[in-house]
A protein has these predicted regions:
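Non-catalytic signal-transmission and effector/linker regions of two-component phosphorelay proteins
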Residues: 1-12, 19, 129-130, 136-141
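Two-component/phosphorelay signaling modules centered on CheY-like receiver
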Residues: 17-44
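Acidic, metal-coordinating helix/loop segments flanking the phosphotransfer/catalytic sites
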Residues: 25, 40-58, 65-68
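Two-component signal transduction core modules
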Residues: 59, 88, 112-113
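Short amphipathic alpha-helix used as the core "switch/output" element in two-component signaling
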Residues: 70-85
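Alpha4 helix (beta4-alpha4-beta5 surface) of REC/receiver domains from two-component response regulators
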Residues: 74, 95-112, 123
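Hydrophobic/aromatic residues positioned on beta-strands within the core alpha/beta folds
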Residues: 91-92, 115
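C-terminal output helix
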Residues: 99-100, 116-127, 138-139
Length: 141
């Protein structure tokens, strides 16, 4: 599927495991050419600092940062308040924690993708950019 090149958008990736951060960045670089990764953060503080420099169109957010599973939800709700147009896509390894997913969606996340076996695809990312809500690769309207 060819996505129009002029439909470019900027992404910040927030992920505290370096290997996963690199892997996710690679996926964007190779699979989603119209996305420009303008920054990556491994801590919440790094992320807020990045936002002062440049605002992305989408944040790819790991729910658990630095050992806290709830911090992603907090980041999400404060993004919703301060930047209502910014898309927030949650990328999480918290497979069995359904309460967390519900909290994330209630906090205004535009989508949740599980890290287990589900690769981030251009289609998913584009769906969220187009305003669909995505839970585990199934758009919900």
């Amino acid at each position: 599927m060819h996505i129009m090149e002029n439909n470019r958008f900027k992404v910040i990736i927030v992920e505290d495991v370096k290997l996963e951060l690199k892997g996710t960045e690679e996926i964007f670089r190779h699979e989603i050419p119209n996305a420009e990764v303008i920054g990556t953060a491994m801590t919440e503080n790094e992320f807020w600092e990045l936002l002062k420099v440049q605002l992305p169109d989408m944040v790819l957010l790991d729910l658990g940062l630095g050992g806290s599973t709830t911090i992603g939800v907090e980041i999400c709700s404060s993004l919703r308040k301060n930047y209502p147009d910014m898309k927030v896509l949650i990328f999480t390894g918290e497979v069995l924690n359904e309460k967390l997913w519900v909290d994330a969606l209630n906090a205004g996340a535009d989508g949740i993708i599980l890290k287990t076996g589900e690769l981030l695809t251009a289609t998913d990312v584009q769906a969220v950019m187009d305003g669909k809500r995505l839970v585990f690769n199934y758009p919900i309207l």
